[in-house]
């Protein structure tokens, strides 16, 4: 018999969170239910999943097609829901007809909001941490620190993407015995190994990510500009949703100031279905992520796994759990956070690298992802966690 798991989100589902859909899809022998006070009809409303669509959206008769439609209203609604949890009260009544065996909240603050529901119904709660919720959320909202303490005490299990995430949660008081490592993962066959030929003295770099501070876009541009004088046959392509408008303006100014227009191509949001083919045009993926002033961070970016799966080495930083995804001197090169000179040196090294050495990096990258980040294995481990909580025999 399948385990019934109710997955809890703020919104189902922004395109940039397609990885969450893939986690649910890869977990075997689970009857998936999804609850969120904001639902979107953007390709993730599977017929075999049960969705608790908010009543007000049912009254409207249609759902927004993406995260950009009705954005201002969505933000107001979610803030209102945090103060007056009307949707959660409705959900408590609705789940009585298909009562789940487990609740699985995605992101720490979501877990805090649904903890009273778990306590009232007696349904075990699993909470997954991914990024901003590790340190940024409790820094900006100090009241969350106490709520995290209660969450760590009452939840059946807490998941983190890697050892750094585990250490951060333990430092905040989460018992080690409750923490389960569930790495960010992907399907390697969706990004099959692609043969590239690398000549010394040429390099095409690419960075694909939502344009926010923690992704390190300005560090990429500065390192690229620093390396350019020694690496004239180099190009950089940037792609991603332009979320942080102030950062976008700063990037534009930097490109103009240093006359990089002929060397830097800047694209908009790229659908995930096009990403694998798009990456064939480049030799190295770069993402120098770092902490922001408000302690926003990456858990473990899926994009650098996808790039490596396709045989592309990665330049990144020793930020959070990224060193478990990219192995220094084996599948890519790592620099310290905000080390522009170090990043430039990594770029220059790949620029002058010959094909034989490049192929070693390429083969290692693909094998590393296939062996350690196949989402089907992650799904099996997650299902085993559910079984352990419910004391189900394997």
Pin down the residues of each PLM region.
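Nucleotide-activated donor-binding/catalytic signature segment of Leloir-type glycosyltransferases, i.e.
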Residues: 248-273
């Amino acid at each position: 018999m399948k385990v019934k798991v109710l997955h809890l989100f703020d919104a189902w589902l922004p395109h940039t969170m397609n990885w969450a859909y893939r986690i649910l899809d890869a977990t075997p022998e689970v009857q998936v239910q999804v609850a969120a006070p904001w639902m979107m009809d953007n390709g993730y409303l599977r017929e075999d999943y049960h969705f608790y669509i908010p009543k007000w959206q049912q009254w409207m008769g249609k759902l927004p097609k993406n995260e950009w439609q009705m954005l201002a209203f969505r933000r107001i609604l979610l803030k209102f829901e945090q103060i007056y949890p009307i949707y959660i009260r409705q959900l408590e009544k609705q789940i009585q007809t298909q009562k789940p065996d487990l609740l699985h909240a995605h992101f720490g603050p979501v877990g805090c909001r649904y903890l009273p529901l778990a306590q009232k119904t007696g349904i075990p709660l699993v909470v997954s941490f991914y990024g901003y919720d590790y340190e940024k959320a409790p820094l900006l909202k100090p009241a969350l620190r106490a709520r995290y303490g209660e969450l760590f005490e009452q939840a059946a299990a807490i998941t983190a993407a890697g050892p750094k995430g585990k250490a951060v949660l333990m430092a905040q008081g989460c018992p080690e015995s409750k923490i389960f490592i569930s790495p960010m993962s992907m399907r390697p066959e969706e990004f099959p190994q692609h043969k590239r030929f690398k000549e010394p003295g040429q390099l095409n770099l690419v960075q694909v990510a939502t344009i926010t501070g923690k992704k390190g876009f300005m560090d990429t541009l500065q390192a690229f500009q620093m390396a350019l004088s020694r690496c004239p046959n180099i190009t950089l392509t940037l792609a991603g949703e332009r979320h942080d408008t102030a950062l976008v303006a700063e990037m534009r100014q930097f490109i103009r100031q240093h006359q990089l227009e002929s060397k830097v191509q800047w694209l908009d949001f790229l659908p995930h279905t096009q990403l694998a083919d798009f990456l064939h045009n480049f030799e190295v993926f770069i993402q120098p992520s770092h902490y922001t002033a408000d302690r926003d961070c990456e858990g473990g970016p899926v994009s650098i796994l996808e790039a490596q799966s396709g045989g592309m080495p990665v330049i990144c930083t020793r930020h959070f759990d990224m060193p478990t995804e990219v192995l220094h001197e084996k599948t890519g090169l790592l620099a310290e956070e905000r080390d522009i000179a170090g990043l430039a040196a990594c770029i220059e090294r790949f620029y002058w690298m010959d094909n034989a050495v490049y192929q070693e990096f390429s083969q290692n990258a693909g094998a590393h992802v296939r062996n350690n980040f196949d989402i089907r294995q992650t799904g099996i481990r997650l299902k085993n966690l559910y079984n352990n909580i419910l004391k189900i025999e394997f």
